Amino acid sequence: SLEYGKTINFVTELKVVFADGKEYAVKPLTKPQLVAKMSQGDYEGDLYKKLFNLVEKHYDEIKAAKPNVTKNSMGYYLWDVWDRNTGIFDLTKLIVGSQGTLGFVTDIKLRLVPTRPYTGLLVCFMKNIKPLGEVINKVLEHKPATFESFDDNTLYLSLRFLPSFRKYLGWWGLVKLLVSLIPDGLMLLKGIPKLILMVEFNGQTQEEVEQKINTLRDDLKPYGMAMERDETAAKSQKFWIMRRQSFNLLRSKVKDKHTAPFIDDLVVNPPYLPQFLPRLRKIIKKYKLQATIAGHMGDGNFHIIPLMKIEDPKEKAKLLPAMEEVDDLVLHYKGSLSGEHNDGLVRTPYVAKM
């Protein structure tokens, strides 16, 4: 999550079966411990020696290649394995996120954090995304638990297929959803926003959550956005349903098309989003892709999964040029082609570009 960061930051030790078939404990090592490990004269020692020599020899180049984003799952995390400043060599940084390609993880030790039981949401409706970079920076100053978003297409689909939410909510749940959306429906009569921002806060008390929401709302007033406070998890449910279920609804309603996740996990540093998002939408429109844009705004991580009739040669012909245009756009802003979903067959050919 935005508040806690990536799993990799909470892994303290692993047990891993490497290519020799033996299980090894993997954890951060000090420089003396690393030297001792490399001197063992066995498979494990040779592994550490080769990897250390590799990252030390190319240290500056590896550090310079790190994408300018808070999320990235392209390639291997070589830049976090060896830190000259601290003298720590941490092989867990390489194993986490490698998806079993370097070894089989059999045991994981994690650092835990206490939960905060109360949660609330501030929803912002942006008709003009020009000040988006400033808004994002202002929101991040308040250290929210999560910072999500979805676009006007997602909102439109949610409203269009609203009765179908009964499948997930039941009749009574659907009725409550419809009632809760009445104020939002009246607000939407004044115009559909280009982007809906969802800023979530957690706290030890309900009062703490409400104070955080109110403080952020006051700071965002100069941007002239319509805003809605949903101080409890129950009140904020309607927006989470739209954010999470609209694509599933679209997929279930369009019977002759299939999901095509080829530009589904891109990341761009949030300050660039006001320039990036309009250019991205132009590419989507150019290739006539039926797609919504939703994602993790605080990290600039977006999930775009078009519905396409892949068996149609004309549709299939769109895949490569559309992907290359989107990828080039992402890399123009020094982003990543995958924040969460790793490389796979689709993105592996583009690792070298990163």
Model-inferred region functions:
Residues S1-E141, E148:
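FAD-binding subdomain of flavoenzyme oxidoreductases
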Residues N85-T86, T92-P321, D327-L329, Y333-S336, ...:
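C-terminal substrate-recognition/cap domain of FAD-linked oxidoreductases
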